[in-house]
Amino acid sequence: MSSDPIRIEQRSRAQCGTFWPLHWDYLVQDMFDETDTEADRAYFCSEEYRGAVECAMARPANRVHQVFFHRGSQHIGCAQYVIYQDEGGKCLIMDFWLFPPYRRQGAGHDCYWALEQAARDEGAAWFAINYHSDGAHRFWRSLGFADDGTDEYGDPLMRKG
């Protein structure tokens, strides 16, 4: 594994076209399971969802951020997050993933620390994320997140800070 630092590339709304195919692959390969309905799967892979997120990227407040993680010259993963200043600086990590060749080597931790610092620089005071697998739960706990009940959809929620 390279010791190069993680670089975060913020994607603008105009640049997000390259994000969506990667996001859809991530959802299909890593996120969807037997608890997700066909309607859920269709929505999160739809132009409707994409349009809603892209509109949220243009909001003046509580704007969605799409980022690419780079180590050296390699694009190793992606994330989406939003900082809610009207909720005490809550940073909701909507999506966070590394491409399979870069997993289980410490790069996920490095990417999270880079994302946390970037979000704190933008006003984040605390962090929240949903998880959908035991492995994801262990990963987020290893970064200092603690269980925080469920969200409005009944999905398990974790919090840090």
Predicted region positions:
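Short glycine-aromatic motifs
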Residues: 6, 62-64, 145-146
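Acetyl-CoA-dependent GNAT
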Residues: 10-89, 94, 99, 118, ...
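Conserved acetyl-CoA-binding loop-helix of GNAT-fold acetyltransferases
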Residues: 98, 104-117, 142
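Short glycine/proline-centered loop/turn elements that form peptide/ligand docking sites
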Residues: 108, 112, 133-136, 153-158
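Conserved GNAT acetyl-CoA-binding A-motif
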Residues: 119-132
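Conserved catalytic-core motifs of GNAT/GCN5-like acyltransferases
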Residues: 128-130, 141, 146-160
